[in-house]
Amino acid sequence: MKDLLQYAACFLAIFSTGFLIVATRTDCWMVNADDSLEVSTKCRGLWWECVTNAFDGIRTCDEYDSIYAEHPLKLVVTRALMITADILAGFGFITLLLGLDCVKFLPDEPHIKVRLCFVAGTVLLIAGTPGIIGSVWYAVDVYVERSSLVLHNIFLGIQYKFGWSCWLGMAGSLGCFLAGALLTCCLYLFKDVGPERNYPYAMRKPYSTAGVSMAKSYKAPRTETAKMYAVDTRV
């Protein structure tokens, strides 16, 4: 059961980390929902904006200005949150790999491996927090912006909805939460694995046997009175 939970958490962690990284690097956080011309598909990401022609499939991308330039608060905060989530998720996944029983790292220290799994689970739980905040905040902002335009009967020629990159960010964050929950539960389910449990009575028996044998081989010195009493009894 322990191995099954570890492998399930590892499976979730690797896909969640991949989803977060792909979501951060791709450009489809916003996609056009209603295009009056219907000749192109526009996608906006955290780093650039791309337009794909619907007829010939030609794709052109324009990068945003330098990171030091002024950008909307939504873009800057989402960048920071997603990069933080990527780093934490990657660190948690590497720590989890070292804690797996099938990995030959500290094979004689199972209690340390359990602690590594606990640390990995904690880091993954923390990694899911900025990821879900950044993804949901971006999606809500896009929805509110679109709803406000519709409410005021304003049509700018194109309206956006959140795209698959935003969905990947949410999925990766939820996967980190689930993997972290599995790993932290593993520590309590298998908390009996420790240094005391690794050395059972059978391994401690030689020490007690040696102590008994040494006690048997040890003979207290006889006093002069005892020696005289022994001689008298022989006579």
UniProtKB/Swiss-Prot annotation:
- Give a yes or no for keyword Transcription regulation in this entry: no
User: What's the main place this protein lives?
Assistant: other
Q: What is the organism of origin for this protein? A: Rattus norvegicus
Q: Which ranges does the record list as Extracellular topological domains?
A: 25-79, 137-169
Residues in compartment: Cytoplasmic: 1-3, 101-115, 191-235
The name of this protein is: Claudin-16
What this chain does, per the entry, is described as: Forms paracellular channels: coassembles with CLDN19 into tight junction strands with cation-selective channels through the strands, conveying epithelial permeability in a process known as paracellular tight junction permeability. Involved in the maintenance of ion gradients along the nephron. In the thick ascending limb (TAL) of Henle's loop, facilitates sodium paracellular permeability from the interstitial compartment to the lumen, contributing to the lumen-positive transepithelial potential that drives paracellular magnesium and calcium reabsorption.
The protein's matches in InterPro entries, at most eight in alphabetical order, are given as: Claudin, Claudin16, Claudin_CS, PMP22/EMP/MP20/Claudin
Top-rank taxon of the source lineage equals Eukaryota
Q: Which UniProt keywords apply?
A: Cell junction, Cell membrane, Ion transport, Magnesium, Membrane, Tight junction, Transmembrane, Transmembrane helix, Transport
Q: Which family does it belong to?
A: Belongs to the claudin family.
Spell out the reaction equation it catalyses. Mg(2+)(in) = Mg(2+)(out); Ca(2+)(in) = Ca(2+)(out); Na(+)(in) = Na(+)(out); K(+)(in) = K(+)(out)
